[in-house]
Amino acid sequence: EKFDSGKILIDGVEISIENERAVRNIRREIGMVFQNFSLLERLNVYENIAFPMKSWGYSKKEIDQRVKELIGLVELTDKMDAYPKHLSGGQKQRVAIARALTMEPKILLCDEATSALDPKTSESILKLLKDINDKTGITIIVVAHQLSVIRDICTHMAILENGYLASSGKTIEVFVNEPAALRRLQAYKSNEANLSIVFQKNHSIELSQMIRDLNLDVNIIDMQHIGMDKKTVHYTVHVPNEKLETCMEWLEKKKIYASRLKGMEQIDA
């Protein structure tokens, strides 16, 4: 599709829609995972994964080696000869991920890749993507409406509103600083939260220590884990306004990441 204005840059190289050869070459470097799996029902797991390489004219030996490697990577070795109609949603998405990796792309684009899955299956797919990133170093771009997906797997995030970039940055910093765009997205029901804190470890002990040391009344509005290892915890809390500055000083001394929050009446500021 053509766009009205701007440029498309991949690895610093501008890609022109009019330059079909450039677009064709870059397609080999981008793998795509869709929400609805997009598997060919008449082909089995092995054949679905092999399809891109066959289309590009690779030898049978090259295809067999790569496909078996990827089937092992997505943990579907026992489903090699199965057809899509006999697979669960999670298994279908694993096949789709393997197929997207056949051409050894530099970028894996996941468009709502977990939105059609139940929470447990979604978590297993996110873990698989994280493992693939760790093992191969591939860049993974995730398009999602579920903030939990972004929070669990992404190191950086961007929020789009009406076609414009509303906010971006490191995931942990965006969730802590809670810009207006994120708060609109989250649609918080409470307007009392005035402090955002990220604990890297022992979150319950550190929070209890702060409450004890400062003699605080703390209302925990929200608590969310960040990252697949669940070690980093983000708290959104309300503390008495007269204690807010003291809390910030205490957290700074402990080298704990924290940020003041504005009231919801300022959400559009």
Please place each PLM-identified region on the residue numbering.
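ABC ATPase NBD coupling module
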Residues: 2, 15-31, 55, 60, ...
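Conserved ABC transporter NBD signature motif
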Residues: 6-14
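Conserved signature/switch motifs of ABC ATPase nucleotide-binding domains
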Residues: 82-85, 102-103
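Catalytic Walker B motif of ABC-type/P-loop ATPase nucleotide-binding domains
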Residues: 108-111
